[in-house]
């Protein structure tokens, strides 16, 4: 790891975090239900994009942090954009509000939808490539 790698991850993380904040606010202005739609859409769209880009960049999962593109885009931007911790917090908040069933649904739907989105876009990238 070089200082330049650290810079790319940090800059990308800042960009991704700002994107997450901005999209979360926009979704929150229109969606007022109990389901944490903003975090859900952010994580699924991030999984979709990372599936495609990992194929496009030819990511070797044994050394996925090795290039500037991987460090800046995959780890930085998409790592800052998606949020596992917010997903967990949303589920805890739902549980504390007596909506345990919705919390479980949210977690399962998030994981399965994210896996499907990443797989689908990786397959699309392979078809194009």
Curated annotation (Swiss-Prot):
Belongs to the fluoride channel Fluc/FEX (TC 1.A.43) family. It holds the Pfam family CRCB. InterPro entries: FluC. The chain crosses the membrane at residues 4-24, 39-59, 65-85, 100-120. It comes from the Bacteria. GO terms for biological process: cellular detoxification of fluoride. The keyword Cell membrane applies. It catalyses: fluoride(in) = fluoride(out). Keywords: Cell inner membrane, Cell membrane, Ion channel, Ion transport, Membrane, Metal-binding, Sodium, Transmembrane, Transmembrane helix, Transport. It is found in: Cell inner membrane. It is a multi-pass membrane protein. Na(+) is not transported, but it plays an essential structural role and its presence is essential for fluoride channel function. This is Fluoride-specific ion channel FluC 2. Na(+) binds at residues 79, 82. GO terms for molecular function: fluoride channel activity; metal ion binding. The keyword Cell membrane applies. Fluoride-specific ion channel. Important for reducing fluoride concentration in the cell, thus reducing its toxicity. Signal peptide: none annotated. GO terms for cellular component: plasma membrane. It comes from Brucella suis biovar 1 (strain 1330).
